[in-house]
């Protein structure tokens, strides 16, 4: 397991990696990352608009799930994308001041928008870190793994989570 995680860290340009079949889905992996980093009183800002439904439950913004981040005392805010589907860098700079996490959903999810490019992820990271240098830029990279020569962690993201069921597992991984 350790060697596989070392290889995955190299492939993604990351300091370290957790590459485990124990993560049952992308949402499970994202949840582990969010609960591992955020603490009561911290604020996360979703900078690509409202996250998709399963993650909305993890955060607590749908009001139907128990044991979510908001119940844990994490504050939530969001910045919608601009009308053309690109990040609102001015809005990101305004809302990320004082925040612990800048959260980027790279893929379109269930929205009618294009996936974010690495250049856009880098621009978002720069905008957030310009106003809050110690902010953690996290990327939901589900469906984004191995689609380009670099990964978000090589373009300004501090933390990235994805799903083995999708691109890395080629659709044949039984979990993760």
Kindly give the residue locations of the regions a language model identified:
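Conserved PLP-enzyme active-site core in the AAT-like
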Residues: 3, 7-10, 24-176
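Early transmembrane hairpin of solute transport permeases
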Residues: 14-23
């Amino acid at each position: 397991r350790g060697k596989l995680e070392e290889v995955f860290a190299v492939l993604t340009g990351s300091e370290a990696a957790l590459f485990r079949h124990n993560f049952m889905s992308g949402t499970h992996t994202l949840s582990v990352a969010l609960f591992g980093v955020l603490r009561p009183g911290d604020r996360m800002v979703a900078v690509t608009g409202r996250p998709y439904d399963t993650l909305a439950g993890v955060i607590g913004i749908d009001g139907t799930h128990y044991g979510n981040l908001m119940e844990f005392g994490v504050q939530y805010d969001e910045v919608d994308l601009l009308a053309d589907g690109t990040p609102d860098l001015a809005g990101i700079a305004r809302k990320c001041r004082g925040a612990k996490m800048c959260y980027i959903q790279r893929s379109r999810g269930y929205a009618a928008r294009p996936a974010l490019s690495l250049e856009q992820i880098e621009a978002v990271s720069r905008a957030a870190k310009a106003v809050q240098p110690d902010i953690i830029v996290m990327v939901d990279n589900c469906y984004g793994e191995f689609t380009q020569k670099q990964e978000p962690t090589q373009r300004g993201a501090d933390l990235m989570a994805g799903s083995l069921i999708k691109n890395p597992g080629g659709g044949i991984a039984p979990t993760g």
